[in-house]
C-alpha cells in the first residue's frame, strides 16, 4: 500500500482537462491508497464555502466518494484556497490539517506543508500573507456579498500576477535556511511540499544527517504526485 500526496491543481472552469484528469485520479489511483493528502491550491481561487460554483460541488462529491471508499483524505490550505472551510471539508469528507503537520509513515518521520511559508526571501508576499491570514479580516471578507468577494479576488489575482512578473525566480523559491529550520524544529528527515511548481527531490543536511525535500509539481499538462511506501518515496508524473 501507499500514501499519496498532491498539490497545486489550481482547479477552475477554464481548465477542464485538469479537472477531468483529477477525476480520473480520484476514481483510480487514489482508491488504492492508504491515505490521500492534498497540500494546498486544490482550487485556483476560493472566496467562501457558500460559493455555489458547480465545480466545487462536483469536486466535493468526487473526493467524498474516495473518503467513503475507505481512503482518508486530508487537506492543508494553500495560498489560493486558504479560505476553504469546515463546510466544504465536511461535504468532501476531508480532514483539515494545520499548515505544518508531521506524519509517521512506514518508519519515516515526514513533515508536510503547502510550502509558501518557506519562501521567506519574498518579503512582499510574506507581508501580504500575514495580513490576509488575520482571522478578523477573513471574517469581514466572508461577510461581504458574493459578487463583491468575486471582484476583490479578481483584483487580488491580477495584482499578484503583476507583482510576480517583476520578481526573480530565486526570490519566489524556498529559502534554504527556512527549510532546514522547519525540518530541525520538527526533527524530521523528510519534507514534502508544493507551492513553487518546481518538482524535484533535493538532498540536504538537517538534524546533522542527510535529509530530503520533495517538491510536488503543479498540474498543468500532466499530473504530479508523491507516492510513499515502506520501500520508497517517489515523485511521479503521469498523463491526465
From Swiss-Prot:
Positions with a binding annotation for substrate: 79-80, 122, 160, 164, 167, 195
Entry GO terms, CC: cytoplasm; extrinsic component of plasma membrane
Keywords: Cell inner membrane, Cell membrane, Hydrolase, Lipid A biosynthesis, Lipid biosynthesis, Lipid metabolism, Manganese, Membrane, Metal-binding
A matching Pfam family: Metallophos
Top enzyme class: hydrolase
Pathway: Glycolipid biosynthesis; lipid IV(A) biosynthesis; lipid IV(A) from (3R)-3-hydroxytetradecanoyl-[acyl-carrier-protein] and UDP-N-acetyl-alpha-D-glucosamine: step 4/6
Major localization listed first in the record, in broad terms: membrane
GO biological process, one term: lipid A biosynthetic process
Binding-site list for Mn(2+) 1: 8, 10, 41, 197
The reaction(s) this protein catalyses: UDP-2-N,3-O-bis[(3R)-3-hydroxytetradecanoyl]-alpha-D-glucosamine + H2O = 2-N,3-O-bis[(3R)-3-hydroxytetradecanoyl]-alpha-D-glucosaminyl 1-phosphate + UMP + 2 H(+)
Co-factor: note: Binds 2 Mn(2+) ions per subunit in a binuclear metal center.
Cofactor(s), by name: Mn(2+)
EC number: 3.6.1.54
Segments crossing the lipid bilayer: none
Molecular function in Gene Ontology: manganese ion binding; UDP-2,3-diacylglucosamine hydrolase activity
Residues annotated for Mn(2+) 2 binding in this entry: 41, 79, 114, 195
Matching PANTHER family: UDP-2,3-DIACYLGLUCOSAMINE HYDROLASE (PTHR34990:SF1), UDP-2,3-DIACYLGLUCOSAMINE HYDROLASE-RELATED (PTHR34990)
NCBIfam families, A to Z: lipid_A_lpxH, PRK05340.1
Name recorded for this polypeptide: UDP-2,3-diacylglucosamine hydrolase
Amino acid at each position: 500500500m501507499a500514501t499519496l500526496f498532491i498539490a497545486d491543481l489550481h482547479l477552475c472552469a477554464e481548465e477542464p482537462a485538469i479537472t477531468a484528469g483529477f477525476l480520473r485520479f480520484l476514481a483510480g489511483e487514489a482508491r488504492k491508497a492508504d491515505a490521500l493528502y492534498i497540500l494546498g491550491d486544490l482550487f485556483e481561487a476560493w472566496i467562501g464555502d457558500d460559493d455555489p460554483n458547480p465545480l466545487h460541488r462536483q469536486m466535493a462529491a468526487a473526493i467524498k466518494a474516495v473518503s467513503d471508499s475507505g481512503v482518508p483524505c486530508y487537506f492543508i490550505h494553500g495560498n489560493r484556497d486558504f479560505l476553504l472551510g469546515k463546510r466544504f471539508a465536511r461535504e468532501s469528507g476531508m480532514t483539515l490539517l494545520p499548515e505544518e503537520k508531521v506524519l509517521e509513515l512506514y518508519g519515516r518521520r515526514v513533515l508536510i506543508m503547502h510550502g509558501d511559508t518557506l519562501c521567506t526571501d519574498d518579503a512582499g508576499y510574506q507581508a501580504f500573507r500575514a495580513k490576509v491570514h488575520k482571522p478578523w479580516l477573513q471574517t469581514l471578507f466572508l461577510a461581504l456579498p458574493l459578487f463583491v468577494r468575486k471582484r476583490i479576488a479578481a483584483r487580488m489575482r491580477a495584482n499578484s500576477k503583476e507583482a510576480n512578473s517583476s520578481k526573480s525566480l530565486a526570490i519566489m523559491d524556498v529559502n534554504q535556511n527556512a527549510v532546514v529550520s522547519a525540518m530541525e524544529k520538527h526533527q524530521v528527515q523528510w519534507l514534502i511540499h508544493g507551492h513553487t511548481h518546481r518538482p524535484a527531490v533535493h538532498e540536504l543536511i538537517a538534524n546533522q544527517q542527510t535529509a530530503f525535500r520533495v517538491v510536488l509539481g503543479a498540474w498543468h499538462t500532466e499530473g504530479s504526485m508523491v507516492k510513499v511506501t515502506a520501500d520508497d518515496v517517489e515523485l511521479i508524473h503521469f498523463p491526465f
